[in-house]
């Protein structure tokens, strides 16, 4: 648990530094687009996840790998240099947290709020629209929703907005029931 907090803290600091630099250079939307593209690549590629997380690969290997991705995807020089710095400092494993924190900062700057939604099954367009409307009413800001499917939830939904987590998943309800039965 402490590792998650430490990693998240590191991710937030690096994200803030990148956001400040991108703001100075008026490149926040372009850098955000680069990072969203990289986030999708991380989600799609097991090899990339292994490269980032595995201690078997040195900082130089990680830097070269991220640089090759940045070149192929035609990332902005700001993004490419940042990825190189992250790898050189041995923080490549924190990249997913950096991306999430950067997205939150960019959303806040636009007056929106970033919401990470996890469901057991993909949301239909009507469900996504209803969820966006409910979040807009509850939060008072326009939500920028990122969806993820996790069959382990069994049913229901989890919504993470900033540091708040709204968990209405069947998995958490069953876990609560199991805990209550063990206590009785």
Curated annotation (Swiss-Prot):
Main location: membrane
GO CC entries: plasma membrane; proton-transporting ATP synthase complex
Pfam families associated with the record: OSCP
Subcellular localization: Cell inner membrane
Keyword set, alphabetical order: ATP synthesis, Cell inner membrane, Cell membrane, CF(1), Hydrogen ion transport, Ion transport, Membrane, Transport
GO molecular function: proton-transporting ATP synthase activity, rotational mechanism
Bilayer topology term: Peripheral membrane protein
InterPro entries: ATP_synth_OSCP/delta_N_sf, ATPase_OSCP/dsu
Taxonomic superkingdom: Bacteria
Family label: Belongs to the ATPase delta chain family.
Functional description taken from the UniProt entry: F(1)F(0) ATP synthase produces ATP from ADP in the presence of a proton or sodium gradient. F-type ATPases consist of two structural domains, F(1) containing the extramembraneous catalytic core and F(0) containing the membrane proton channel, linked together by a central stalk and a peripheral stalk. During catalysis, ATP synthesis in the catalytic domain of F(1) is coupled via a rotary mechanism of the central stalk subunits to proton translocation. This protein is part of the stalk that links CF(0) to CF(1). It either transmits conformational changes from CF(0) to CF(1) or is implicated in proton conduction.
Assembly: F-type ATPases have 2 components, F(1) - the catalytic core - and F(0) - the membrane proton channel. F(1) has five subunits: alpha(3), beta(3), gamma(1), delta(1), epsilon(1). F(0) has three main subunits: a(1), b(2) and c(10-14). The alpha and beta chains form an alternating ring which encloses part of the gamma chain. F(1) is attached to F(0) by a central stalk formed by the gamma and epsilon chains, while a peripheral stalk is formed by the delta and b chains.
PANTHER family the UniProt entry points to: ATP SYNTHASE DELTA CHAIN
Protein name: ATP synthase subunit delta
Organism of origin: Phenylobacterium zucineum (strain HLK1)
Gene this chain is encoded by: atpH
